[in-house]
């Protein structure tokens, strides 16, 4: 079962990082179009915060 937990841990870690990276790319694209540059920053912050919160809330349960 430890192998399954390690797989879940790895998947969560990389999916959280991918989510943050994707939001950053979208934010850069929107800023380069000069369309209300505060919106992508807000969206990116919310996505990054939710990803970090999900990761931190999941992590203690596995240790």
Swiss-Prot record:
This is Transmembrane protein 033R. It comes from Frog virus 3 (isolate Goorha) (FV-3).
């Amino acid at each position: 079962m430890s192998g399954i937990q390690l797989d879940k841990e790895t998947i969560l870690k990389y999916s959280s990082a991918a989510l943050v990276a994707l939001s950053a790319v979208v934010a850069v694209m929107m800023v380069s179009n000069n369309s209300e540059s505060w919106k992508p920053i807000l969206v990116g912050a919310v996505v990054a915060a939710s990803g970090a919160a999900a990761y931190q809330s999941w992590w203690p349960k596995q240790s």
